[in-house]
Swiss-Prot record:
The keyword Glycoprotein is annotated on this UniProt entry: yes
Primary gene name: Ccl24
Cystine connections: 33-58, 34-74
Protein name, entry field: C-C motif chemokine 24
Family the UniProt entry places it in: Belongs to the intercrine beta (chemokine CC) family.
């Protein structure tokens, strides 16, 4: 009797540990994933940046637009307006900023006969 009680207690302990290590019906979705998409077009002037929600990590591949107010909005990357927003944001990112100015530098140029001239 003591032997079978020990075996049953050991099995119950093993099952309890397995449930803690491998939770049943538990799926962790990263916070940077989209579970659903909005259907309404976001005005272009409200969007400041975007992130890609990777389909290999997330249940759905999506584009997360970040608005001026800091809201994160999941959108379907297959939609034409989403693709256009991405292209325009990428183009803005690659342009020099409006505050940037051309910098003039002076340096000596060595010419024949040892003369130097500033340019």
């Amino acid at each position: 009797m003591a032997g079978s009680a020990t075996i049953v207690a050991g099995l119950l302990l093993l099952v309890a540990c397995a449930c803690c290590i491998f939770p049943i019906d538990s799926v962790t979705i990263p916070s940077s994933c989209c579970t659903s998409f909005i259907s309404k077009k976001i005005p272009e002037n409200r969007v400041v940046s975007y992130q890609l929600a990777n389909g290999s990590i997330c249940p759905k591949a999506g584009v997360i637009f970040i608005t001026k107010k800091g809201h994160k909005i999941c959108t379907d990357p297959k939609l034409l307006w989403v693709q256009r927003h991405i292209q325009k944001l990428d183009a803005k990112k690659n342009q020099p900023s409006k505050g940037a100015k051309a910098v003039r530098t002076k340096f000596a140029v060595q010419r024949r006969r040892g003369n130097s001239t500033e340019v």
